Amino acid sequence: MESLGTVTILGHGCQWIDLNPCARYIIAMSLRLIRIIIVLMGALLVAGGAYTVYWYNAAAELRAGIDRWAQDRRAAGWTVDLGDPDITGFPTRLEAFFQTPQISGPDSWWRWVAPNIRATAAPWLPGEIAVSAPGVHVVTRRSGDVWAELDKAEADIVIENAAMKNIVARLAGVRIRLPGGEMLVAESAVMRLLGSVPATPSIDVGAYTPHPDPSDMGFGVALDVRKIVLPDQWRPVLGRNIGKIALDAVIVGEIAPAASLKHTLTRWRDGGGTVEVAALALYWDVLRLRTSGTFALDGKLQPEGAMVADIRGIEAAMDRLLAAGVINSRAAFAARIISRALSFGGGSARLPLSVQEQRLFIGPAPVLRIKPIRWN
């Protein structure tokens, strides 16, 4: 005999078990679970709606920031054509796409025509931006056009307090055509620009690095370029192939943009500007150089400075320079004597180098006249 909610168990006697409490418990737990699910779904809908509003506000602020930057540059005399950037990437990123932007400096003394540029940031970290711009970049100056074809062009930019704090650029497959038609090629290049930093090394090139004054602060520049091929038209004495150029330096002194590069450098020099080279490495055929030192500009805006260098292969390099007529026999002889006197067991030599009045000195001996730099 059965009835709703009861079970009859047959045995030595009849027992009646009422299942109504179990059913009520199961129903109560099911309702509680349904309520939890409804609350969670409501919370997710509210959070999703709030995040959607946040993302679109961030996208609007990004577009407004781009417009403000362009307007500020135009007010300073620049010509800026960014087109109508596309802002996409919802929901996981903010992505700005610029189609072939063009920018010209004041008085049109330079002009940059870029390929398509894509900039991406996480909505919750808008100050950390990843930029990609492979393709052909054209920089036009009064001396002519420079074409740079880049198989890979990426950069990571960190912005803090409306100012650029850190930029790391990575290039690969670099082919540069200069105004005279010369081709300069590099397998890869990495460049880092830092904001206010002390004049201390951030890369190790194996060179002796003096301890700088802790008060020396400036604009940090680090560069590492590999497998460079120089233009044949230059007829480089040590060969066209450079294995490596690595630089870690701090530019000390205020750099205030002026009407031209020459005027900008003049202001920087007059304000006591210097370049503290914490580390420099050059691997060029037979020559291996690792050095550090301090440089500035003289009254004619030509480099001058002093450094201590570890050099390997200086005698072979002097022989090539002598054979090419770049230096005379007296300078080559002086370089050999100084190198042998200061070398370590016939290996590398630690030599004092200086640049003054467009001449390179090894110790007190002038060995090479340097062509003047035309900043205009």
Residue spans for each PLM region:
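N-terminal type II signal-anchor transmembrane helix
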Residues: 30-67
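Acidic, serine/threonine- and glycine-rich low-complexity intrinsically disordered segments
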Residues: 183-282
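Flexible, membrane-facing loop/turn or short amphipathic-helix motifs
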Residues: 102-110, 137-148, 173-188, 227-240, ...
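Extended terminal
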Residues: 25-41, 83, 264-270, 274, ...
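N-terminal beta-strand/beta-hairpin edge segment
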Residues: 75-208, 280
